[in-house]
Amino acid sequence: MMKLRVSEAPFPGAPVMVMIAGLGGLGGYWLAQQSALSRDYQVVVYDQRGTGDNADTLPEGYTLADMAQELHRALLIHGVHRYAVLGHALGGLVGLELALAFPEAVSALVIVNGWLSLSAWTRRCFEARERLLLDSGPAAYIAAQPLFLYPPSWAQENQPRLEAEEALHNAHFQGTENLLRRLWALKNADYRERAARVITPVQIICARDDMLVPWTCSQALHEALPHSRLDVMDFGGHACNVTAPQPFHSLLYAGLASLAPAPHKETV
């Protein structure tokens, strides 16, 4: 069974927020958001299948729909039947799969730096990273990750953090075969024919300076979804929730309030 980390509910009847990381797959990506959201939500984070605490060998042909099915089953086992989703890139697209397959379960969806279909630019970035992984190995692949995730000015000011992250990712690397299969799943996800069927209210957050996924991809996704709002950050890069947490949280809370107002603990 997939392992989930489920926080205590902050008050009786608190809504559930499921956080889904991107290609790296580790729930620790959401550390800053866990702290912020745990005041109003029962928070669920997890390491995706084939990564971290959920080590496994992924099958050939593994898809984002498979990822969504696995997560939904694990949530049901934990007694979670209705939840909001906060997903980054791959995680946001897994959220779309959940909204399409289980519309009665997903109360709201927030997609951070996601897309409707893979852009030529993002495909070029992925293919370059794949070649780096295959030709030079995992250490070189991991060393290059910050180039795609962070604005240069932020990275320059956070060198000790980048070095610590690099050491952590090397120690917990998901494996070349797993990573390639997750990349295959991500590159082949396409919602152009299905987006109009999403009835879940969606907030889309993107960063104008994202070097991996052009912000216009979020704009195209917004235009294709029937019930969505688009919030664009001027700074933050692909990992904008990490590099600019306060502006990100302000947009996130405003969006969540408009999509699905959270019940608050009664005061006497």
Curated annotation (Swiss-Prot):
Catalysis performed (reactions): carbamate + 2 H(+) = NH4(+) + CO2
Annotated AB hydrolase-1 domain residues: 15-119
Class in the EC hierarchy, top level: hydrolase
Cysteine disulfide links: none
BP GO annotations: nitrogen utilization; uracil catabolic process
Keyword flag Thylakoid: no
Keyword Acetylation recorded: no
One CC-aspect GO term: membrane
One Pfam family named in its UniProt record: Abhydrolase_1
Superkingdom of the organism of origin: Bacteria
Family the UniProt entry places it in: Belongs to the AB hydrolase superfamily. Hydrolase RutD family.
Function comment: Involved in pyrimidine catabolism. May facilitate the hydrolysis of carbamate, a reaction that can also occur spontaneously.
The name this protein goes by in its record: Putative carbamate hydrolase RutD
Native source species: Cronobacter sakazakii (strain ATCC BAA-894)
Upper classification of the organism: Bacteria, Pseudomonadati, Pseudomonadota, Gammaproteobacteria, Enterobacterales
